[in-house]
Amino acid sequence: MSQYVPAEGFVSNAEFLGKLISSAPKFETVSNGKKEIFYNIPAGFDIETSSFYYHGEKTAIMYEWTFGINNIITYGRTWEHFKTLLAAVTAVLQTHQNRRLVVYVHNLPYEFQCIRKHFSWTKIFFLDNRKPVYAITDKGIEFRCSLKLSGKSLAATAKDLTKYKAEKMAGDLDYSLIRHPETPLTEKELGYCFHDVKVILNYIQEKIEQDGNIARIPLTNTGYVRRYCKNACFPDEEVYTNASTYAEYEIDAIGVSRDERVLSRWLHARECPPSREIMYEGWLIRLYKFLSIRFGSKKVSDITRKVSWFS
């Protein structure tokens, strides 16, 4: 993988594509182990909008977009220009459903309400109503939420950068002004747009280097907690990744029958035997998609023997 050098300024759409064409053969790709390949490079997208009321209903107009791949950043003023550019990007990188470019957006739920009608989507994952954490187009562009990953504002995320510094410009755009795609923008205003995407690119590049590759970056910051718990509870990766072996391991580790294990995957419960000699403990396990706390019957001697399991 070539050395990452942060972007220094905007380039035109034509220069952006020219640099992308010359750089594309050098871009590394990685697999997530599920027959899906990702470009192991940072990419970011951001828009600026003006909100106002029209016939009593609140609406918004996108008047500027910024798009960056690796260390190349460009901008435009209309959706048509962005769609034309993105179509060219997918052609250059030859992306499709199993060969994707991950594009991070800081606060994807907001941007998605603006872009959802401009593309065809094959898969969208929502954490809540109208709150997607990722969305995949039919051309293999996967938009992800960097806000869910960092858990912080863009300004706070910029302050946390350690290797690739990129401070968010002081202040912000004057959102009280109503702008549209033909409204002239000053160099200072364009500077805000540039630095916002530069922060995203530098942040994702640091995550790529810290996590090993882009396929290992979780969707949200809580994914790191789940990964830590999995590694702590099941340090043997071969046992964990082999489904049948893992099932036997789980049955032996928590002392349940095969029938009880099958039921627990759906009911998350177990009958409590009426015995004074039994007390109930809980421990973290991985059932279906989420970490759960399973309560099972154990003798006091068994519990004291397993106390070190949590330390």
What residue spans do the PLM features occupy?
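Metal-dependent nucleotidyl/phosphoryl-transfer cores and adjacent nucleic-acid-binding surfaces
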Residues: M1-S311
